[in-house]
Amino acid sequence: YGFCGRLFDEYRAYNLDSSFVYAQRKEELAHRMDKLDYLDDAAMNMAEVMGTTGMYKEALELLGQIDKKTLPDYLYGYYYHLYRTIYGLMGDYAVTEKVKKEYYRMTDLYRDSLLQVNASDSLGHVLVMADKCIVHAQYDEAIRMLMEYYNKPSLDDHSKAMLTYTLSEGYRLKGDKQGQKHYLALSAIADLKSA
């Protein structure tokens, strides 16, 4: 099960078909082991791939089958992250303003849930908080908190890639093209190093 999980993680960024296959294998193994938390994790992996490929309805149906009351603490962040991401994508592609607003409202709710379950000193918390600031046009505050975290010496390349990409978004929306380019370049470099 753990090996399939590592393969899912390796493939998720560039080969969704393969990552989905490993999520399905995780589900098969979880059934054999009769481990509910493994089943929930595998279902969330499949929902992640579905959401990434635009199968929003199917992803939400799969997530809706998970009983939140029995979900172990270590899976709450992933659970809320998936809902936040899928509703955010649905909002981005909604045709009518009314539907777009509803999806973004749901995105905000799950973003707030994420902030409650992520440790306040974690990268996940900082990225979600910066995302919230960016959505509410508080670009300078988002940039400030991201820069504060960026200067931590223990940051790995994958984390740097995510953080600098979010910084580039803050600068883009602020209208600072130079800052945007600078942090996009740093994000690309960190992404390549982490591959």
Where are these regions (language model features)?
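A "functional boundary" signal
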Residues: 1-195
